[in-house]
Structure formats: C-alpha cells, structure tokens
Amino acid sequence: MDLRSYDGLKEAVREYLGRGDLDDKIPLFIQLAELRLNREVRMRVMERRATTEVQAGQTAVPLPWKRKAGDWDVFMEMRDLVWMSNPPVNLTYMPPDLYAVKSVVRGLPRQYTIIGRDLFLVQAADADGKLILTYYAEIPPLSAEQPDNEVLITCPDLYLYAALVEAGPYTRGSAPVEMWTQYYSAAKQKVEEQEQRARFTSNVAMAPIRRI
C-alpha cells in the first residue's frame, strides 16, 4: 500500500474504519479532510509564486484561480507582494474599508487590498510594471486525475488522520474518533514545528578552533 497516493490513502482509510458499508463515502471523507487542511495548515509546499504584468492606470489585478485537476492553482493567502521597480517595493496590506475612501491617484504602488478574487493597488501605477506574488494556494484535491499532491507526499499521516476525523459522524460511535483527533492534532503540531525549524535558523553553538 502506497499511502502517498489517492488509491493508497483510500485503502488505508478503509482499513482503519474496518467497515465495508462506508467504502463509497471515503472520497467524501478525503474531500472534507482537504477542506480542513486548507483552513488549518500552512506549509512551504503550499506556497506558489506568480508574475503578473500590470498596465499603467490599472488598479484591479485578478488573483490566481484555476480549478482544473493537474493544474490546480487557487489563491488562499498572501505571503509577499512585490512591485518590480528600481528598487523593488514590498507592498503592505490595506483593509478594504480604508481602500474605499482612498483617493485614486497614479504613482508608485505601495499598498494593496484584496476584495473577492482581485487585489487592488494603491496607488494605481503611473507606468506599466510587474507584480511578483508569493502566496499560499489551495491543496490540489485528490482524484483519479490528481493521484497525489505535495501535501500528501510530504505528510500522508496528516491526510489520513484528517480523513478519519471527518468520518466520525458516519461511524456513530463505532470508531475511536477521539483517538484519531488526538493523532491528527499531534501530526499537525509536528508539521508546524518542522515548518518553523525550516524557516528560522536556530542558534548554533560553535566550538572554538583548537590550535596545535
């Protein structure tokens, strides 16, 4: 059994549940698990980068929103936004209510807000330019056309326990849902700790060189 594949994950959920009458519900449990993971987990493998050309005077820029198996790219949360000028400018976030009362003038964009599926620049650029977006994208949902994804490959146990937790309402007390919830929470905590270590270098004590 390859737990890092859609078929392997379904088989593992089936074995853990130990109930043949729920086999047709397993894809639903996995879909619900993906919704949970999109809400609760942020990993480096969920990060994407995109470059967008912006015309002079343009304020609204569409966010990535592709929902196609094998080419899934749906924006969830901004990590970094850079206007490529000389020097480049890191844009800061502005709440939509402040953007609504901001005077529309052209110049060098320094801020942005997000409304719906678009980001809006403040100020509107006075010349053509380029934006570089770094963002968290949705986990590509597993299916026959999408047999794996980076999150499943990186932490299949997290995927498995999330699916088992979502199966809870269907088991009607016949499965150890509380235990699976604990396993899911523990796996999520380990992922968060691993991500933290990867992003921030810890202080390393260096021994002095011994001269001979």
Set out the residue ranges of the language-model regions.
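Glycine-enriched, solvent-exposed interface loops adjoining structured elements
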Residues: 1-212
